[in-house]
A protein has these predicted regions:
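Basic, Lys/Arg-enriched alpha-helical interface segments
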Residues: 2-56, 76
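Enriched for short, Lys/Arg-rich terminal
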Residues: 29, 61, 67, 71-93
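Short gly/ser/thr-rich secondary-structure transition/capping motifs
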Residues: 51, 61-62
Length: 93
């Protein structure tokens, strides 16, 4: 299955990578690579993450304390949000 990003998720991904890169040179690159690694896992085994909400699965990324929120559609896996665990998940709805 192919992966698609919602506009919001893509923006969160880019902004988070920039934030980490601004903190420590190279950390943004490590963040992006970790997200890509997790997206590969999702792509190869879409049902591996916990079904948390009605149709949204959540994969926890412990290295950076982020979660990837996604849903499985007919032809795509849609990344709905890439969310830092310190944020209120109610804002996703």
């Amino acid at each position: 299955m192919k992966i698609k990003f919602s506009f919001k998720a893509k923006k969160e991904f880019i902004n988070s990578a920039k934030f980490y890169e601004g903190r420590v040179v190279g950390l943004g690159k490590r963040f992006k690579q970790e997200i890509r690694n997790q997206l590969d896992l999702i792509q190869h085994n879409p049902k591996s993450a916990e079904l948390k909400y009605k149709d949204i699965r959540v994969l926890v990324i412990k290295t950076f304390a982020f979660t990837i929120h996604y849903k499985i559609e007919k032809e795509y896996i849609v990344i709905v949000a890439i969310f830092h665990s310190s944020r209120n998940p109610e804002k996703l709805r």
